[in-house]
Amino acid sequence: MEFTESERLQSLSDEYILGGVNSPSRSYKAVGGGAPVVMKEGKGQYLYDVDGNRYIDYLQAYGPIITGHAHPHITKAIQEQAAKGVLYGTPTELEIKFAKKLREAIPSLKKMRFVNSGTEAVMTTIRVARAYTNRNKIIKFAGSYHGHSDLVLVAAGSGPSQLGSPDSAGVPKSVAQEVITVPFNDIEAYKEAMKHWGNEVAAVLVEPIVGNFGMVEPKPGFLEAVNEITHEYGGLVVYDEVITAFRFHYGAAQDLLNVYPDLTAFGKIVGGGLPIGGYGGRQDIMEQVAPLGPAYQAGTMAGNPLSMKAGIALLEVLEQDGVYEELDRLGKKLEDGLNELIDKHDITATINRVYGSLTLYFTDEKVTHYDQAENADGDAFAKFFKLMLNQGINLAPSKFEAWFLTTEHTDEDIEETLRAADYAFSQMK
């Protein structure tokens, strides 16, 4: 493939945009560098770059585009609303309709509020949990990304009883000292952390199915134990379902797993491709939020009619019969095919799959927590990424990210992807 125009535009972008990208995950730094491909158009399961190359897209904008690019039903809804105005600064009926559909799908959202991103959603759940409990400390699990607000950009201490340290320049040490980080799926470490800090913990942040160091499911009983222990100490359980809501079935992961939090943050998919975030949960907790309570949250763009209209249209697509069964079928076909090729070429790799999402790790052990994902071979992934890209397969440029299937992917797309992987693996010796 030729990338001449992408390289030219990326060089121009470097003159005006810091680092040439508006989010660091879009750079190719984690896969050895080089100019990221500049895309021009998306249609269904495909992306087209400025050089005219076509890609089968498994990045899907890091998750939101579950119905594929430019889905006609969602596009029509956006066009209709844009003609009526995109922002009023007043309540609209669309907010009510969208909230009703969300609560029907995710019953734990007794009351909810809309914001504009997953970062805002998680940030606000922390504020609300602190207001409700009158406590300050937060527990999070290593490797889970909860947005770029200060409190969640914190690295683990040397053990569960140790406080965190800043994971980004500009995060004060005093902020990091309010966060305890423990390994996912390690209930003994969680018990130890709560033994030391439980009476000061406002909330634990949990991805019920992890999506930020690949797709990692909870061990049986882990989420139930986290709920029980947290509530024993008077803390709240907050689920970050920014990636997982509507990813695996029509609803949230909590409904699939039958384990429920006190508060939930959501985003990505539910906006139909437009900026969105939201949070909700128990009514008594949510009543801490202004104008009813003392915890302040506001936003000029929050609940804007364009995102509400797109979200409603998105749910109308996903609630159709057979959508998630087909995603699961294609996901299994892709997983099985990749595993056959791994065996054929004697590649050291393993796959985690949850329905229509999967992660290929270049490691010989099953990944159940962050350290195992971190130890996967990044150089091998970088080589695989570039070999696939040059055959028209668009993956996330990071060994930690998932491959996302959409309602538009077909058997033929899976077969083309497997042919590309066959060649890529053959070149990795």
Swiss-Prot record:
Enzyme Commission designation: 5.4.3.8
Known pathway: Porphyrin-containing compound metabolism; protoporphyrin-IX biosynthesis; 5-aminolevulinate from L-glutamyl-tRNA(Glu): step 2/2
Gene name of the record: hemL2
Cellular component GO terms held in the UniProt record: cytoplasm
Residues annotated with N6-(pyridoxal phosphate)lysine modification: 268
Protein name per the record: Glutamate-1-semialdehyde 2,1-aminomutase 2
Subcellular localization(s) per the UniProt record: Cytoplasm
The keyword Cytoplasm is annotated on this UniProt entry: yes
Species this protein is from: Staphylococcus carnosus (strain TM300)
InterPro entries: 4pyrrol_synth_GluAld_NH2Trfase, Aminotrans_3, Aminotrans_3_PPA_site, PyrdxlP-dep_Trfase, PyrdxlP-dep_Trfase_major, PyrdxlP-dep_Trfase_small
EC top class, as a word: isomerase
Cofactor: pyridoxal 5'-phosphate
